[in-house]
């Protein structure tokens, strides 16, 4: 029979010979089979030494522990190598991507072509179409066009309008979308012709506006003095007064026709050959009421009058303030009728420089009174009404 030492050596040898077939060792690149046999031949020495010392440890677990330690020691340094080799590759890829992005950004910022400038200019010109487009978009969102458009058409219209507004708000998009922007420009001018007309008029006639600007100020300044008079109360403007033996002066008298109307139903004598006219208390009785009607034509220039007066009830005609100029619009002939009452000692003269003197015969009452009282001719001065 075999001795225990031979059995132990045989068992240790068999265990050592079984390790080279392990796939784990071959995966991690362990040493060759010859080296493992040499290690197995020298392996029983520690067992025999332990056996001589009286201890019988199992050689298998020792071998397994040793192999496991070696495998762990050999496996752990392999991971740092792989990690170290992978990390530089990842870092280089990130650096390359960042460098590429920087280069593209620099190229886009530095290289601006004429097309890019034209695109930006067109976007700025079409900025005026953004408010009506947004109003149209809001109307679509609120359902203002539900009767005329289907839901699909409304969604498509909203999408198109949003894209157009987005393009107009980004003038830095560049030459790439210039053709599309030109098509959008034609479409917007078709949709909103009034805005296109306003832009063309504003762009082409700025210097004309600056030239016409002072003229508008002068027109407004010329029309401003007349506006307070129109706003004033008629009662304040309608008081006209006459004082006996106080002449009325006329600076520049326009072309007009004069008609004297008596309160009693008598015939009004027409204008006759040049001469002079005078009224005294002879032909007209005391307290006789007369009316003066002035027909003013185009080209009327402002005239003034000055005389202390007594108030007379306002009339339907436009009144005049004594001592202040009055401007009449040249829209057409105007009629001014001012009824007055003549006292017994009142005299009325008519002698304007530009108005020819007229000779007239007044008929008052019955023809018998006209025969008994012949008309008297004298120089006269006309009221400036």
Swiss-Prot record:
Biased-composition ranges for Polar residues? 70-79
Task: Please name the GO terms of the biological process aspect recorded for this protein, alphabetically.
Answer: circadian regulation of gene expression; locomotor rhythm; negative regulation of DNA-templated transcription
Q: Name one GO molecular function term.
A: E-box binding
Tell me yes or no: is DNA-binding among this UniProt entry's keywords. Answer: no
The record ties this protein, via Pfam families, to: Ciart (PF15673)
Q: What does this gene product do?
A: Transcriptional repressor which forms a negative regulatory component of the circadian clock and acts independently of the circadian transcriptional repressors: CRY1, CRY2 and BHLHE41. In a histone deacetylase-dependent manner represses the transcriptional activator activity of the CLOCK-BMAL1 heterodimer. Abrogates the interaction of BMAL1 with the transcriptional coactivator CREBBP and can repress the histone acetyl-transferase activity of the CLOCK-BMAL1 heterodimer, reducing histone acetylation of its target genes.
The protein depicted here goes by the name: Circadian-associated transcriptional repressor
Origin species = Homo sapiens
């Amino acid at each position: 029979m075999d001795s225990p030492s031979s059995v132990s050596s045989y068992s240790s040898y068999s265990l050592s010979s079984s390790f080279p077939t392990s796939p784990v060792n071959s995966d991690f690149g362990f040493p060759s089979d010859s080296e493992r046999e040499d290690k197995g031949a020298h392996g029983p020495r520690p067992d025999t030494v332990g056996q001589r010392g009286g201890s019988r440890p199992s050689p298998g677990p020792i071998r397994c522990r040793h192999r496991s330690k070696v495998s762990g020691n050999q496996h752990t340094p392999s991971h740092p190598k792989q990690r170290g080799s992978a990390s530089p590759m990842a870092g280089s890829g990130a650096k390359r991507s960042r460098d590429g992005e920087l280069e593209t950004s620099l190229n886009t910022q530095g290289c601006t072509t004429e097309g890019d400038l034209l695109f930006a200019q067109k976007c700025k010109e079409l900025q005026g179409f953004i408010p009506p487009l947004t109003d149209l978009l809001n109307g679509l969102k609120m359902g203002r066009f539900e009767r005329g458009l289907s839901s699909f058409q409304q969604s498509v219209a909203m999408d198109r309008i949003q894209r157009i507004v987005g393009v107009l708000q980004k003038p830095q998009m560049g030459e790439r979308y210039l053709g599309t922007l030109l098509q959008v420009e034609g479409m917007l001018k078709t949709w909103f012709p009034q805005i296109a007309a306003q832009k063309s008029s504003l762009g082409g006639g700025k210097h004309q506006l600056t030239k016409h600007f002072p003229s508008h100020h002068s027109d407004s300044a010329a029309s401003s003095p007349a506006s307070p008079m129109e706003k004033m109360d008629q009662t304040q403007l309608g008081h006209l007064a006459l004082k006996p033996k106080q002449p009325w002066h006329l600076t520049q008298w326009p072309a007009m026709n004069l008609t004297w109307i008596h309160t009693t139903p008598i015939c009004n004598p027409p204008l006759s050959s040049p001469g002079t006219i005078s009224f005294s208390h002879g032909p007209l009785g005391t307290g006789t009421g007369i009316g003066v009607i002035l027909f003013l034509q185009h080209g009327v220039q402002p005239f003034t009058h000055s005389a202390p007066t007594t108030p007379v009830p306002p009339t339907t005609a436009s009144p005049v303030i004594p001592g202040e100029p009055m401007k009449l619009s040249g829209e057409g002939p105007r009629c001014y009728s001012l009824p007055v009452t003549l006292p017994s000692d009142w005299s009325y003269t008519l002698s304007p420089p530009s108005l020819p003197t007229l000779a007239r015969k007044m008929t008052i009452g019955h023809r018998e009174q006209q025969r008994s009282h012949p008309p008297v001719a004298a120089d006269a001065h006309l009221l400036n009404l």
